């Protein structure tokens, strides 16, 4: 973050200065009293189980220059500033929106049901060849992570790629009011969070909130093979990316190299790109095509775009292939799961050589689709010839309806012995479930064994 003054902060958050020097400089923003550094402003957030206002004195004592507060502390420490605001989370949003407005660089906002983080990372990899690029860390894509990402901007940055997630209506709009994108990306519309939104059509409406803050002369980049996204019509320039003939950015000549990755050709109105994607899964061609389209739009050369795709590295626990002795391969894709991403990952496993083991768990937030979706995934494991299926979790029991040979366990701890026993020589093992299942415990156990 570039230094700002208390006066600038005060104006950005529309607050009331209770105490402090308006000329004092602020070097950063922190919402965690445990990690606050000298010169930062502490923003106490209120959650279901905590109230950051209880830690204001601790943060100030640790070196914070001052704080925002909706609840004023009983004691105001001398030499520090205190700004009163109605709501600290909204103040954080206002500050991030004001700070982002100080930068005239291209901002890319990414959302979608599946593949947000992968696509964000791919775009950042491509843009990073030419531009010093800020990107959302991990998947810090909510009301707290997005402003923190934006507040990490510096004058050295030449582009920014911001991932925004949602589980309810209005969330993408809220985040977009901070990002104000020049380029808006929707990866697809799937069943994630359908429990809360009711239908794919409602999910589409929620995702399309991204366009409410897209600049009038901006660019929309959409999955051209997504039936619902093909109903979207915008006044802004729109590029549809995919395998279909109508796509503006066309993927062809897809060569599946198994766990070694994918090769494909991406053709735009201007250029033909021969792309080598260093991670498995045919679905990766969409992220690569979108990244190529954006790179070209922002003036990158053919060589820069091809090099950026080849340099892509997956974010943590997203189809991360770990190799072991005896040709054992662990496909760590445990960060999250929905029906579409689970099917895509199982197809990667199905294309792998040797014995194939799927360790799969609950797919959450599917509402009325829960039983059917899990049963269909079970059927897919049978169709793909997966040798061993280990299903874990309450919802995962429905996998066995689609594949009666699947082994079922109620919890990760109960299944651990069977998982270890199945990870034998010449085995490719996929580990995937919704984040709430904490399948990272399985990966940690296997990698330390």
Language model features by range: what are they?
Residues 1-94, 98, 350-354, 379-380, ...:
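N-terminal leader/targeting and accessory segments in enzymes
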Residues 8-11, 91-224, 228-237, 295, ...:
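Phosphate-binding loop of NTP-binding sites
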Residues 10-12, 73-79, 185-329, 354, ...:
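Acidic, Mg2+-coordinating active-site environments of NTP-dependent enzymes
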């Amino acid at each position: 973050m570039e230094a700002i003054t208390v006066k600038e902060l005060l104006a950005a958050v529309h607050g009331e200065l209770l105490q402090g020097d308006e000329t004092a400089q602020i070097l950063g923003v922190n919402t965690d009293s445990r990690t606050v550094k000298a010169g930062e402003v502490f923003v106490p957030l209120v959650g279901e189980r905590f109230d950051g206002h209880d830690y204001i004195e601790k943060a100030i004592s640790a070196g914070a220059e001052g704080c925002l507060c909706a609840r004023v502390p009983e004691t105001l420490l001398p030499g520090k500033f205190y700004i009163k605001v109605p709501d600290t989370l909204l103040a954080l949003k206002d500050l991030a929106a004001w700070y982002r407005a100080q930068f005239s660089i291209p901002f890319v906002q990414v959302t979608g049901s599946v593949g947000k983080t992968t696509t964000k990372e791919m775009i950042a990899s491509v843009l990073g060849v030419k531009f010093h690029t800020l990107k959302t860390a991990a998947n810090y894509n909510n009301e707290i992570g997005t402003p923190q990402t934006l507040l990490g901007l510096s004058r050295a940055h030449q582009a920014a790629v911001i991932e925004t997630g949602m589980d309810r209506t209005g969330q993408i709009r809220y985040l977009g009011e901070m990002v104000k994108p020049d380029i808006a990306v929707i990866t697809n519309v799937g069943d994630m969070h359908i429990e809360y939104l009711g239908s794919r059509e409602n999910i589409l409406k929620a995702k399309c909130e991204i366009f409410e803050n897209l600049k009038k002369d901006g660019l929309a980049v959409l999955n051209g093979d997504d039936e619902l996204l093909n109903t979207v019509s915008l006044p802004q320039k729109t590029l549809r990316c995919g395998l279909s003939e109508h796509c503006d950015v066309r993927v062809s000549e897809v060569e599946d190299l198994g766990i070694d990755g994918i090769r494909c050709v991406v053709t735009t109105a201007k250029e033909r790109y021969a792309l080598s994607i260093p991670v498995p899964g045919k679905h990766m061609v969409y992220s690569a095509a979108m990244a190529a389209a954006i790179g070209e739009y922002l003036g990158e050369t053919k060589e820069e775009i091809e090099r950026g795709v080849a340099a892509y590295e997956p974010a943590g626990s997203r189809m991360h292939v770990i190799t072991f002795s005896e040709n054992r391969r662990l496909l760590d894709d445990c960060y999250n799961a929905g029906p579409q991403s689970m099917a895509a990952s199982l197809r990667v496993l199905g294309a792998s050589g040797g014995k194939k083991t799927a360790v799969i768990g609950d797919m959450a937030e599917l509402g009325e689709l829960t039983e059917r979706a899990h049963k269909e995934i079970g059927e897919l494991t049978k169709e793909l010839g997966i040798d061993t299926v280990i299903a874990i979790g309450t919802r995962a029991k429905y996998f066995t309806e689609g594949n009666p040979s699947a082994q079922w366990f109620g919890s990760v701890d109960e299944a651990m012995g069977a998982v270890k026993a199945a990870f034998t020589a010449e085995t490719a093992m996929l580990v995937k479930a919704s984040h709430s299942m904490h399948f990272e415990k399985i990966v940690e156990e296997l990698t330390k064994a």
